[in-house]
UniProtKB/Swiss-Prot annotation:
Family per record: Belongs to the short-chain dehydrogenases/reductases (SDR) family.
Catalytic machinery residues: 152
Official protein name in the record: Galactitol 2-dehydrogenase
GO biological process: galactitol metabolic process
Changes seen on gene knockout: Deletion mutant cannot grow on D-galactitol. Does not exhibit a growth defect when grown on D-altritol.
Residue spans crossing the bilayer: none
Reaction(s) this enzyme catalyzes, per UniProt: galactitol + NAD(+) = keto-D-tagatose + NADH + H(+); keto-D-fructose + NADH + H(+) = D-sorbitol + NAD(+)
UniProt entry tagged with the keyword NAD: yes
PANTHER family, A to Z: SHORT-CHAIN DEHYDROGENASES/REDUCTASES FAMILY MEMBER
Amino acid sequence: MRLNNKVALITGAARGIGLGFAQAFAAEGAKVIIADIDIARATTSAAAIGPAAKAVKLDVTDLAQIDAVVKAVDEEFGGIDILVNNAAIFDMAPINGITEESYERVFDINLKGPMFMMKAVSNVMIARARGGKIINMASQAGRRGEALVTLYCASKAAIISATQSAALALVKHGINVNAIAPGVVDGEHWEVVDAHFAKWEGLKPGEKKAAVAKSVPIGRFATPDDIKGLAVFLASADSDYILAQTYNVDGGNWMS
């Protein structure tokens, strides 16, 4: 098993991509901490995985809570080997329609949270002197601007840049930092995304989702199962010589 006895802390892991990663990491032998603001759902998800998983409540916008959770995990499990910054929110508005409230919320969750998670966890990794792996979740939205997705695109572009800077700063401590940029991923959140598009583009419910799926060269949305294999690879020793990269998992939407 590629992650045997590793300790993995995953934010936003009660559902969706984060939960898929938690399940995959546990199957590879890791001890998994499902950190999510929705503690009830996180607890249910951890119980379904079994004794290899533990749920903790975490609001990534609360810096004191970040420090407390990281400290508690470090003390209970004897370190943290893997961090996945997955917690994020979506927002939709053109530049002339954004609000200060939306700006602060998107960047607090999508950028500030991951930045300070990296700070707290990397300091634990450095203190334990056994290296580690950090995986940040970017997006195809961070590769290019989209007229109606101003704040989300900007926050995910910033994650790609932050990944590169963190990677260069932490490599001397044996810590590899990389990112994954998924394309369109099916899940509960698409009901919200579809509703946003219906509002801004005057579409019927479900119309945008169908059009987006059709536009993907592979011809469908991704699922967490399409992404988890790359996450396991980046969390394992197989990726020891990979640094500061952002991997597209988008069905061919973005070619590099």
